[in-house]
UniProtKB/Swiss-Prot annotation:
SUPFAM superfamilies: Uracil-DNA glycosylase-like. It is found in: Cytoplasm. This is Uracil-DNA glycosylase. The active site is at residue 85. Excises uracil residues from the DNA which can arise as a result of misincorporation of dUMP residues by DNA polymerase or due to deamination of cytosine. InterPro entries: UDG_fam1 (IPR002043), Uracil-DNA_glycosylase-like (IPR005122), Uracil-DNA_glycosylase-like_sf (IPR036895). One of its GO terms (molecular function) is uracil DNA N-glycosylase activity. The keyword Lyase does not apply. It catalyses: Hydrolyzes single-stranded DNA or mismatched double-stranded DNA and polynucleotides, releasing free uracil.
Amino acid sequence: MSDQPDLFGTPTGAKAPHAIMPAGLPASWKEALAEEFAAPYFHALKDFLVEERRTHTVYPPAADVFNALRYTPLENVKVMILGQDPYHGPGQAHGLSFSVRPGVRIPPSLKNIYKELQSDIPGFTPPRHGYLKAWAEQGVLLLNAVLTVRAGEANSHAGKGWESFTDAVIRAVNNRPQRVVFVLWGAYARKKARLITAPHHVIIESAHPSPLSVTRFMGTRPFSRVNAALEEAGEAPIDWQLPAQVEE
C-alpha cells in the first residue's frame, strides 16, 4: 500500500495490483477504506480520471479531491452534510461539499444556507466568503457523493465509481459508536438514508438549498437541530459562525 500524492492527476504506469492510497489521509480513513482502495472499481476510476484530466479540465484539482477526509478524520466526525457533486466552475471546488475557496463568489446554494443560518442560529453573521473549512475542522464531514466533475458539466462523473466509494465512507461513519448527525438535503442525498442504520444516529432531511427548492428549505432549522441532537448525546455543539477573514 503506497501513498500517491498525484492520485488521479497523472498516469503512474501499469495498474497496481494493490491498494492505491491518496496522500495525507488520516490513519482512521486508511483503515476504514482499505478494501475500497484495493477494489477493482477504484483502479478503474483512477484510470478514467487520469484520462479525463489528460483530455479535459476536471475539478477539483487532483490534490484537493480527498480534502473532506483529510480535514475531518473518521474519529472526529460528528456531523455529515452530504452533497451531490462538486461545483463545476473555475476555481470553485476544493473538496468540501458546498464550500468554495477564499476569494471565489459565494454560490447561490451557499447563500441560502447562510440565510437559513441567520434565522436559525442567534447572532450568526454571514461571512463575505464561502470557505467552510472551519466546520470541517470541528467534525463536520462535508462530503460529495461524487468527488470530481468535468468543467462546466454537472454530474458528468456520476456512475464512474465514486458512488461506491462514498457509500463506503457513509457506512464507515454509520459504524461509529458515538452519535453522528446526518444532514441530507434534496432527493439525491435523502436516498442515502438507507445506509444509515445505527439507531443512535440522527438524520435531518429537507429540500435542497438550491434556488429551485429554497422555499421548502428555508425554515427547516437544520443547524440548531444538529446541535440539539449532539448535546442530547453529550457531544459539544458545532460553532456554525465562520471566521470573517480566511486564507488557505
